[in-house]
Amino acid sequence: MKKSYESPVYKVKAVPLEKVQANSYNPNKVAPPEMKLLYLSIKEDGYTQPVVCYYKEDKDVYEIVDGFHRYLIMKNYKDIYDRENGMLPVSVIDRSLGERIASTIRHNRARGSHDVDLMSNIVAELSELGKSDAWISKHLGMSADEILRLKQITGLAALFKDEEFSMSWE
């Protein structure tokens, strides 16, 4: 009998805050008023969504894929840390670096704002990992024009190696 798929959310676990770390590629920013609202939400309702992480077995740490700001609330507010006994609800996914970057962007696209420089660096990193523009478009929900603009920001000619020459570039 074929085993059915089980979403990671059904395996949420309590992880010590000290074992959770930020990733280096999240371009999502939350303004101070929204952070205060997130604090109030967690204070009043508790954690209603787990922080999505990738487990780095070699370092015994959980790297955040989604939920960085929920993590920051526990890290920066002693009352929340104490109430939760320093334990953060975590849902673990096992994906490659490129897939984790894409997942972070997908989780963030509908909320917050994105730092354009960080987004262009992410597109550059994915390109350097061998991801095609079509892959980036599909997995990050970006148009070809948006990818092109973000590549232009980095100014790295290597990112255009798969592009055909256009007279408009002259």
Which residue stretches match the model-derived regions?
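Short, charged/polar connector segments at secondary-structure boundaries
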Residues: 1-91, 138, 148-149, 159-161
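Short coil/turn linker and secondary-structure boundary residues
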Residues: 15, 30-33, 93-96, 114, ...
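Short, Lys/Arg-enriched N-terminal segment that forms or immediately precedes the first helix
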Residues: 100-112
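Generic beta-strand or strand-like secondary-structure segments
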Residues: 72-76, 104, 122
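Short, charged/polar surface micro-motifs in flexible loops or helix N-caps
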Residues: 70-71, 96-98
